Curated annotation (Swiss-Prot):
It comes from Rhinella marina (Cane toad). Belongs to the calycin superfamily. Lipocalin family. Disulfide bonds join C83-C179. Expressed mainly in choroid plexus. Much lower expression in other brain areas, and absent from liver. One of its GO terms (cellular component) is extracellular region. It comes from the Eukaryota. It is found in: Secreted. Monomer. Keywords: Disulfide bond, Secreted, Signal. GO terms for molecular function: small molecule binding. This is Lipocalin.
Length: 183
C-alpha cells in the first residue's frame, strides 16, 4: 500500500514539474483576447477526444469579461443536426494568462494557459484537465478567421508534440458553416 501511495505521489510530482514548464504569453493583455474566435486545431490525449475526433468540426468561441473580473468562455459547435453551446468561467490566477475552471457537470478541473497570441490573428492555449486520477493534456489553436497560415498550423502541431501528444492526438478541425452565425 505504501508503494502505491508513493507511486501516485511521484506521478503527481512529475506532472507538476512537466506542466510547470508550459510557457505563458509574456505581457498577457486580457482585453485583447476578448471577442470571437474560431476553433482551428485541437489536440488531446483524452479518451473522449479519441472516440469523438472523427465527428468534431470547427466551432466558434466567444470570450467576454464577467462582472467579477473573470472570463466567460462560450463555445458553439455543431452536434448532429443542431448547435450546442458549452460555457465555462475562466477564473483569473495571480499569473496573467493563467486561469482555472471547474466543470461541475463532468467533475473535472482545468488549468488553462494562454501560451502565445498576437491577439488579432491567433491564440495557442494549453489546458491540463483533471478528473479523479485521470490527467489529460489539451492544446487548442484559435483564429480570428476560419483559416490560418500553414506556419501557424505547424506551430500548433509542433507545440502539441512538445507536450507529449502524438500525430494521432492532433486534429485540424474541418471547416463548416454550421453554427458559425449562432454567436
Amino acid at each position: 500500500m505504501k508503494g502505491l501511495v508513493l507511486s501516485f505521489a511521484l506521478v503527481a510530482l512529475s506532472a507538476l514539474c512537466v506542466y510547470g514548464d508550459v510557457p505563458i504569453q509574456p505581457d498577457f493583455q486580457e482585453d485583447k483576447i476578448l471577442g470571437k474566435w474560431y476553433g482551428i486545431g485541437l489536440a488531446s490525449n483524452s479518451n473522449w477526444f479519441q472516440s469523438k475526433k472523427q465527428q468534431l468540426k470547427m466551432c466558434t468561441t466567444v470570450i467576454t469579461p464577467t462582472a467579477d473580473g473573470n472570463l466567460d468562455v462560450v463555445a458553439t459547435f455543431p452536434k448532429l443536426d443542431r448547435c450546442e453551446k458549452k460555457s465555462m468561467t475562466y477564473i483569473k490566477t495571480e499569473q496573467p494568462g493563467r486561469f482555472l475552471s471547474k466543470s461541475p457537470r463532468y467533475g473535472s478541473d482545468h488549468v488553462i494557459r494562454v501560451v502565445e497570441s498576437n491577439y488579432d490573428e491567433y491564440t495557442l492555449m494549453h489546458t491540463i484537465k483533471t478528473k479523479g486520477n485521470e490527467v489529460n493534456t489539451i492544446v487548442s489553436l484559435f483564429g480570428r478567421r476560419k483559416t490560418l497560415s500553414p506556419e501557424l498550423l505547424d506551430k500548433f502541431q509542433q507545440f502539441a508534440k512538445e507536450q507529449g501528444l502524438t500525430d494521432d492526438n492532433i486534429l485540424i478541425l474541418p471547416q463548416t458553416d454550421s453554427c458559425m452565425s449562432e454567436v
